[in-house]
């Protein structure tokens, strides 16, 4: 098994546990801040690629320029992300019925961490992509039969703006060039939480991040934690 959705979830879960156990409500606030920080960076990378390709920052473009796709690991386990669209206009609403992140948080007995994570992730990705998209996560799989996500202002219009161009598939770079593998996503997640913890809590935050790295090594193997260290100096705003 390689870098995948479940390791991505595990990283967030361990930061949640260590931050809240060490710093209480301050730790929870730091976890939310770091989740938003991570997600907004991801959304900005998507937006920069779209702008390079001459695409408008609409919800259609957002969907086309998403950075991840289900891994073979999750497909083989039967828990790859599955969703169904229930409306497209004026509000785009879809329901997620199977999610590997939910599966991992549940396996770890950390549904509370999953609730907090999922409440702040996707809306923050959208905010990084275009803050005028209105993205709401009104329920999640952690406490409901399915996750509900709703998006309005689908054109991403700013106040006073009346129209945007349409997404043009012919202008889009190859799909593979819009994606990043889960090695990258896991590294981005780890270093987002680690950097935010260090900036907020100083030496104690740096020590906490090192302990999460030890958690990863113990649960997944030293090769995973060692690989994450290779990204220590990376600028995750860059595309």
Please state what every model-predicted region is:
Residues 1-91, 100-120, 127, 133-146, ...:
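N-terminal accessory segment detector
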């Amino acid at each position: 098994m390689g870098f995948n959705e479940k390791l991505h979830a595990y990283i967030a879960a361990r930061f949640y546990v260590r931050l809240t156990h060490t710093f209480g409500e301050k730790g929870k606030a730091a976890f939310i801040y770091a989740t938003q920080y991570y997600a907004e960076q991801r959304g900005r990378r998507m937006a920069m690629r779209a702008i390079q390709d001459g695409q408008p920052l609409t919800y259609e473009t957002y969907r086309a320029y998403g950075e991840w796709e289900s891994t073979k690991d999750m497909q083989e386990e039967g828990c790859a992300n599955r969703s169904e669209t229930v409306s497209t206009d004026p509000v785009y609403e879809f329901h997620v019925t199977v999610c590997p992140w939910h599966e991992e948080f549940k396996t770890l007995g950390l549904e509370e961490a999953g609730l907090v994570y999922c409440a702040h992730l996707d809306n923050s990705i959208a905010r990084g992509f275009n803050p005028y998209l209105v993205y709401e996560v009104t329920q999640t799989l952690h406490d409901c039969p399915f996750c509900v996500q709703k998006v309005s202002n689908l054109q991403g219009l700013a106040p006073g703006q009346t129209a945007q161009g349409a997404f043009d598939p012919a202008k889009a770079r190859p799909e593979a060039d819009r994606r990043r593998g889960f090695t990258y996503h896991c590294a981005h997640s780890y270093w987002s939480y680690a950097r935010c913890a260090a900036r907020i809590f100083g030496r104690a935050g740096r020590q906490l991040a090192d302990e999460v790295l030890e958690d990863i090594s113990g649960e997944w193997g030293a090769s995973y934690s060692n690989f994450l260290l290779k990204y220590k100096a990376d600028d995750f705003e860059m595309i």
